[in-house]
Amino acid sequence: MLEAMAEPSPEDPPPTLKPETQPPEKRRRTIEDFNKFCSFVLAYAGYIPPSKEESDWPASGSSSPLRGESAADSDGWDSAPSDLRTIQTFVKKAKSSKRRAAQAGPTQPGPPRSTFPRLQAPDSATLLEKMKLKDSLFDIDGPKMASPLSPTSLTHASRPPAALTPVPLSQGDLSQPPRKKDRKNRKLGPGGATGFGVLRRPRPAPGDGEKRSRIKKSKKRKLKKAERGDRLPPPGPPRAPPSDTDSEEEEEEEEEEEEMAAMVGGEAPAPVLPTPEAPRPPATVHPEGAPPTDGESKEVGSTETSQDGDASSSEGEMRVMDEDIMVESGDDSWDLITCYCRKPFAGRPMIECSLCGTWIHLSCAKIKKTNVPDFFYCQKCKELRPEARRLGGPPKSGEP
């Protein structure tokens, strides 16, 4: 018996330790408490009407047991002092709501407004006014994202409804439109000014500069471009007028452009340009070309078709004419008339006569660009020197 009594003696200290580690006064939160808490928050925010259970839940008992329970509950969640403060604020909110429900008078809730202006449960009318104010602020601000979160809007939203209805609307209406105008001025003023500046000044300038540079290069390096395989230029008449108009525009431009115009003006003078115009084609029936019935009679009818053939030729055909085209003849050769068709060079491929050294268009000589002979004789040389057909004349190349 003594042994039996002695055995439980070492087991006695654990029961004494259990109440110390786990006090029986501790209360764990349940789902019902959480639901009550959520319903109270929703009722306070004004999303749902307050009920009797919600008003009676926080105010049951005196203030001291509530604080004790709040302290115990805070230990259940977190022992931080912030939880105690939040619970105490909710208790005060519940007390104020209970007083309003008990008194049910619109005049008496005035003191709580002065003491706790932000803890009041707003009515439906005040909620509607707040929503209208928010909508008006969003409509005025538009795409600006920082305006709803600005301190002014937050202060207006946090104010009580009595001061919120007259003041913020007038201030918002007076302060927001100037911002909108400022935005429009910012969008239209600097952006529009730059846009108009780009449209008026910079765009035409580079375009004209590019045209002038192209014309200048075409006049100086037209033959080199033909060697590289660029597209063939159309006949002389369409190409000459643009140079005239561009030269006139260059004279009206700034000093730098006038210098370029002076350089181009010396290359392509105005009186020489009328030569490739309409009166020139009738001159194809020239006394020089009339006697040879073999070549000239066909050349007069085939000038138009030959020009079309020149325009539709391929790039590979132009490479064959490297030796027969005047490459380093200078800019004056553009309007030079040497062929018996009385049309200028105009960048079209030509071939040099091996005897007299005159340059003649391949189209007038009826020579294909793919089949260029080593020795060529013009109609005059063939008529005056028939032995040129037999012997071939001196071995003179087509280089200039």
Swiss-Prot record:
Primary residence: nucleus
Modified residues (N-acetylmethionine): M1
Ranges annotated as biased composition (Basic residues): 92-101, 178-187, 213-225
Top-level taxon of the source organism: Eukaryota
SUPFAM superfamilies: FYVE/PHD zinc finger (SSF57903)
Annotated GO MF terms: zinc ion binding
Comp. bias intervals (Pro residues): 232-241, 271-284
UniProt cross-references to SMART domains, sorted A to Z: PHD
Zn finger intervals (PHD-type): 336-384
Name of the protein: PHD finger protein 23
Species this chain originates from: Bos taurus
